[in-house]
A protein has these predicted regions:
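N-terminal export and membrane-targeting signals
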Residues: 1-12
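Serine-hydrolase catalytic machinery in alpha/beta-hydrolase-like enzymes
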Residues: 44-153, 162, 166, 170, ...
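Flexible "cap/lid" loop of the alpha/beta hydrolase fold
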Residues: 184-200
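Short beta-strand/loop motif that positions the catalytic acidic residue
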Residues: 202-204, 208
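Acidic catalytic loop of the alpha/beta-hydrolase fold
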Residues: 208-211, 274-276
């Protein structure tokens, strides 16, 4: 059933995309790719990087068929507050994608417990520049892997998704498309003026009590539809197509006619919790839809774009 649903969705997206097809761009490898990879294909290993005076880490997964003569797309996946790169790899299934997967680890922030967090939240570690860390990380990946610099995508959950929103604002020259899930979009003082229109696909459960779908004025959290509409306006989208129902609990909203062929999509899970759609293991509190698989749906969206 799920495969049939996804096939119908893909057909609908392909038909609508004819309205504003993005410009195809030739893939560009970051180097001649003759340097051996830092680990065996098909494995996930913890790697280290010194950035901003701190020793940082990230979980790196190479596809089983990784070869040093092909330029690979890269997906950056940012964990939620208190989680880890390893934990996110487990529930997200992102490592099943035909791409290099990178799961960075945040720095322990403020508040209760020793919980890792990302820049832009009220509990983030003071003075830590995670945007600079992301740039250092991309520089490291470009130097050590055979990757396509034009096909770098960013996703994340909760606090990690909020940080992905920041990257969309300030790193549009390095991040081709973003896919936040259950995003915690706190006020961060950043004037969001990306250098180019950014394709966005956003996922959120209407029953999320951690980051409410309708927003939370006391915490400065916007209503999720308003946040998505902000990106549609930023990307100068002209057309909002009809909403499409997938199964009994998923509704997809789409904006087309956007500048430079970009698109904006919002995937609302009816009664969905603070969870990763399609997860088979714990990803947060509340209902988890199995109607869609977030990793497949976001990949089918972001892979259509390159810088």
């Amino acid at each position: 059933m799920r495969s049939r649903v996804l096939a119908c969705l893909a057909a609908a997206v392909s038909a609508a995309a004819l309205l504003t097809a993005p410009t195809a761009t030739a893939a560009t490898a970051s180097r001649d790719c003759r340097v051996p990879a830092p680990q065996e294909p098909g494995t996930s290993q913890l790697q280290q990087l010194h950035s901003g005076g701190l020793d940082r880490t990230y979980q790196l997964h190479l596809p089983a068929n990784y070869k040093s003569k092909k330029d690979w797309p890269v997906v950056l996946a940012f964990h939620g507050r208190g989680n880890t790169g390893v934990g996110t790899e487990v529930f997200s299934k992102l490592s099943e994608l035909p791409a290099i997967l990178v799961y960075p680890n945040g720095v322990i922030g403020t508040g209760d417990g020793d919980r890792q967090a990302w820049q832009g939240a009220p509990y983030s570690a003071p003075g830590v520049d995670d945007v600079a860390f992301t740039n250092d990380l991309l520089d490291e990946l470009e130097a050590t892997l055979c990757m396509d610099e034009r096909r770098v995508y960013a996703t994340g959950k909760s606090n990690g998704a909020g940080f992905v929103g920041i990257l969309g604002c300030v790193e549009a020259d390095r991040i081709a498309a973003i896919a936040p899930i259950a995003g915690a979009f706190y006020p961060n003082g950043i004037d969001c003026k990306p250098s180019r229109p950014v394709p966005v696909i956003d996922f959120h459960g209407t029953g999320d009590v951690t980051i409410p779908y309708a927003g939370d004025a006391d915490r400065g959290l916007p209503a999720i539809p308003d946040w998505v509409q902000g990106w549609a306006k930023r990307d100068r989208c002209l057309i909002r197509l009809w909403d499409q129902k997938i199964g009994d609990d998923v509704t997809v909203s789409r904006w087309f006619g956007c500048a430079r062929g970009t698109e904006v999509q919002h995937v609302a899970v009816t009664d969905g919790g603070h969870t990763w759609p399609g997860a088979d293991s714990y990803s947060g509190g509340g209902y988890v839809t199995q109607t869609i698989e977030a990793h497949e749906m976001l990949w089918n969206f972001v892979r259509r774009w390159s810088l």
